[in-house]
Amino acid sequence: MKRIILTAISAFWVLSSFAINKTTYTFAEKDGQELKLDLYMPEDTLQEHPCLVFAFGGGFKMGARDEESYQKFLTEIAENGIVGVSLDYRLGLKDKKVKNLIQLAKILEISVNMAVEDMVSAVKFVLDNATEFKVNPKQIMISGSSAGAITALQTDYFLCNGKVKELPQDFRFAGVISFAGAVASFGEKLEYKHQPAPVLFMHGTKDELVTYNKKVVLKRGMYGSNYLIENLWVKNNWPYMALRFRDFGHEVAMLGFKEQVPMVLEFIDKFVLNPSKIYVSDITIAEQGVNEPLLQLGTDGLYGDAEVIISEEVVERIK
């Protein structure tokens, strides 16, 4: 496949910056724990906005919805006219002592399922209050970093396979944004009964913590971004955009939402708000010099696949 080397990603989305109103709500109580979400709302005159629901990272054993880096990301999202939501979810691996891989697999399954349940509850809370929160119910996206990205991808996977009962039967996510995520399998065949939402995959090609390819034994394990793209999205002509960070590891879980917000906004614009017949070719992008990736007209829908090279200077900035 042809590779085109470009040099920087700069802003694609130009909107007025809005003042932001941040409010905290309790959206559920489970296992004796109050689950809260922070709502970042643009203070504008629009009655409906797209909405991005975000789950933090931390290996299902640590992390918090209101960490400074997440606040900055969601504030920037809201400044561009998108309601941002950062949620709590129960941490299934917190304080757990794992003795072997079999025990780890069982606890991980419980952890992923709990996180998905909590993300679904947060989305339902947003849907139930869509008028008050000025959210367009048809433009709700989910996102996350690392464990949160697994949660987002898994939530859409479960929804497509009829495993989500808390949301309206005809509900579909408008998009999924994954910062170093994967889909988990716990013994079943990996398949989607309904077409998934458009996905923005960001992943380091050498990520071994949340695999870029797949780590599966007897149908148990993780299917990473590259495996999902090559074996499902490409074969089924499903809409996606991929940013592959060459020779990077799991630091992309943070680099993505800290350094690549313009690409997030580009994805939302092209795939969620204004889907068209644009095909984004397989591109290698370095950090310096160009305003946007090469866009080519296509006939089969909106797809994207970019390979990103980021300088060591950027790596230092995300630490």
Residue ranges and their predicted role:
Residues K124-Q195:
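Primarily recognizes the serine-hydrolase "nucleophile elbow" in alpha/beta-hydrolase
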Residues A105-T131:
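Alpha/beta-hydrolase active-site loop
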Residues A19-Q47:
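N-terminal cap/lid segment of alpha/beta-hydrolase-fold proteins
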Residues V234-K319:
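C-terminal catalytic histidine-bearing segment of alpha/beta-hydrolase fold enzymes
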Residues E48-G59:
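Short beta-strand element of the alpha/beta-hydrolase
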Residues K165-N236:
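The feature captures the conserved acid-bearing segment of alpha/beta-hydrolase catalytic domains
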Residues M1-K22:
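Bacterial Sec-dependent N-terminal signal peptides
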Residues R65-L87, K94:
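Short amphipathic alpha-helix adjacent to the substrate-entry channel of hydrolases
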